[in-house]
A protein has these predicted regions:
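Charged, often glycine-rich, active-site loop that binds/positions anionic groups
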Residues: 43-47
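Hydrophobic/aromatic-lined pockets within catalytic cores
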Residues: 11, 23-24, 62, 66
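Acidic/His metal-coordination segments adjacent to aromatic residues that form catalytic metal sites
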Residues: 39
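Non-heme Fe(II)/2-oxoglutarate
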Residues: 1-22
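Catalytic core of Fe(II)/2-oxoglutarate
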Residues: 36, 48-52, 61-64, 68-128
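Short, Φ-rich (hydrophobic/aromatic) sequence segments
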Residues: 3-7, 56-61, 125-126
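A short coil-to-beta-strand element that immediately follows conserved catalytic motifs
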Residues: 24-34, 69
Length: 128
């Protein structure tokens, strides 16, 4: 199935070394994988992925997705006035997002604003 293939790809030693070199981090062998289907109104609150996570790889699976559909992964900084967004990534079909994770890598998945489902595969390299 597709999730098993995604896991095998992320577990590939060559890919781990390549992505680790790009990010400047050693990627552990342990993986946590999820398939996401978000519907209108669904979102993830602002959060860092935490101290046990090293890197995240997300694959967009949405054909024809636009900014007006919402559901962007937004990176930024929490402030007293709210979350200040620095950049956004949309889950376009075939687009991948790779980022190093730290206790300061604040991000959110913004609310989905369309009746189309927001689909993605995400994997995290974790130390435990």
């Amino acid at each position: 199935d597709e999730i098993a293939e995604w896991r095998a790809l992320m577990a590939s030693p060559i890919l781990q070394r390549l992505f680790g070199a790009v990010l400047g981090v050693d990627l552990p062998e342990r993986l946590f994988i999820n398939a996401w289907r978000l519907r209108a109104g669904d979102f993830f609150a602002v959060h860092p992925d935490g101290r046990l996570y090293r890197a995240t790889l997300t694959l967009g699976l949405c054909h024809g997705w636009t900014a007006s559909d919402g559901g962007a992964i937004a990176f930024g900084d929490p402030t007293a006035q709210g979350f200040v967004v620095r950049e956004r990534w949309l889950p376009h079909l075939g687009d991948a997002l790779l980022f190093a994770v730290s206790v300061d890598s604040w991000h959110t998945v913004e609310p989905v604003l369309t009746d189309k489902p927001r689909l993605s595969l995400t994997g995290w390299w974790t130390s435990r």
